[in-house]
């Protein structure tokens, strides 16, 4: 059987957030663009994001909100496609939205509205979309040729927007990294990011029967700290504070957790008239911490004496609880993939490979990982726009 040959100006592999934005920008410039998506529909990760409401950007987005071996790489793209630019697009389509917390913007309704907006913009820009398209091979001589079971797609520009390894149940694979290596680009070892951590057997026995208990904490590791909610799970720790710090944590290091920020739980004992008893101490802990966590903490951290020094040691432990996770919940529970195509291989302005003209990498496949709260979508929009405007 002779394969059907399709010719375009630009081929975009992956119909997620970055790929669709790239297609829109390139199509608006008159380029003949094709998006090749292996799934049966576009934007599956968009649809499940933000609890189904899509945390589509963060109004406080800065380069400092991203983790990369080169912290300066993201600056150019983020400056040229800002949260305000995406908000303008959302407002153009009259999609109601709200700020939830810390600058995080969500749809009032459904994430489906964001996907429909992107699909409409693609249609207006003349973008061709091919679903259920499994790629067998990619070659270059001198144009790029993408081979599928029954067709070939040719173009002078190829954009890899295939995402990372997180959430394999919706189709995540190593395809983008494999393709980068095929063309001689280096990869920074990928790993799960924004992911719950798993405790070792000893710590699980101490804390995990408290699954469902949450508290406002400060989680710190590797020079970073985040003040948000922590959630105890059946296997370890989760919640925004833990997801945030997980991207900066590496085994065997510890994560330090302040379980009572801005509080001194033993300060009541400065008054010499206060009885130094467990009942008084437990009452103070319960005023700040969830009851079950307060009681468990005191059961596990028994005072050897009621001296000022012993109370100070207990206070220190409250504000510097050191947990050395056994690992993470892996890509199945990770919101993003850290690591990826080394940024030194790419132009910060266009996302084009320095070694292979016409080859672009955008979105999660690149070694740029945003913090929790809409930053990874903003990187998808910004890197996609940068490549789309360069082709």
Show which residues each predicted segment covers:
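Glycine-rich FAD pyrophosphate-binding loop
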Residues: 27-51
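A glycine-rich dinucleotide-binding beta-alpha-beta segment and adjacent secondary-structure elements
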Residues: 130-131, 295-369
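Short hydrophobic core segments
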Residues: 11-13, 36, 135, 153-169, ...
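Glycine-rich active-site loop/strand segments that organize a redox cofactor
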Residues: 51-101
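Core beta-strand elements of the Rossmann-like FAD/NAD(P) dinucleotide-binding domain
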Residues: 6-8, 149-157, 225-227
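Feature captures the FAD/FMN-dependent oxidoreductase FAD-binding
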Residues: 80-157
């Amino acid at each position: 059987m002779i394969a059907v040959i399709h010719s375009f100006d630009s081929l975009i592999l992956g119909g997620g957030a970055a790929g669709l934005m790239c297609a829109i920008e390139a199509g608006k410039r008159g380029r003949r663009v094709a998006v090749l998506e292996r799934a049966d529909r576009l934007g599956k990760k968009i649809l499940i994001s933000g609890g189904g409401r899509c945390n589509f950007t963060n109004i406080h987005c800065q380069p400092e909100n991203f983790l990369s071996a080169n912290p300066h790489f993201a600056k150019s793209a983020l400056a040229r496609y800002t949260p305000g630019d995406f908000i303008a697009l959302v407002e153009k389509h009259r999609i109601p939205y709200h700020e939830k917390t810390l600058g995080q913007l969500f749809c009032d309704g459904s994430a489906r509205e964001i996907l429909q907006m992107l699909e409409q913009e693609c249609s207006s820009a003349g973008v061709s979309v091919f679903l259920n398209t499994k790629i067998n091979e990619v070659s270059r001589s001198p144009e790029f040729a993408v081979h599928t079971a029954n067709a070939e797609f040719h173009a002078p520009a190829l954009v890899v927007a295939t995402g990372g390894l997180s959430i394999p149940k919706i189709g995540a694979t190593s395809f983008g990294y494999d393709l980068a290596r095929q063309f001689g680009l280096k990869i920074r070892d990928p790993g799960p990011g924004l992911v719950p951590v798993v405790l070792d057997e000893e710590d699980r026995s101490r804390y995990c029967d408290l699954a469902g208990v949450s508290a406002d904490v400060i989680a710190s590791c590797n020079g970073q700290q985040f003040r948000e909610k922590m959630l105890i799970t059946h296997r370890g720790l989760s919640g925004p504070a833990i997801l945030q710090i997980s991207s900066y944590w590496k085994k065997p290091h510890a994560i330090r957790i302040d379980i009572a920020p801005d509080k001194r739980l033993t300060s009541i004992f400065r008054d010499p008239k206060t009885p130094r008893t467990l009942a008084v101490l437990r009452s103070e802990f319960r005023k700040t911490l969830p009851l079950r966590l307060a009681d468990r903490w005191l059961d596990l951290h028994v005072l050897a004496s009621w001296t000022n020094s012993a109370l100070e040691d207990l206070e220190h432990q409250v504000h510097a609880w050191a947990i050395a996770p056994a690992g993470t919940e892996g890509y199945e529970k990770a919101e993003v993939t850290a690591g990826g195509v080394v940024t030194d291989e790419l132009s910060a302005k266009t996302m084009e490979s320095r070694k292979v003209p016409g080859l672009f990498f955008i979105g999660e496949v690149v070694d740029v990982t945003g913090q929790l709260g809409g930053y990874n979508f903003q990187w998808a929009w910004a890197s996609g726009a940068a490549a789309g405007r360069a082709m």
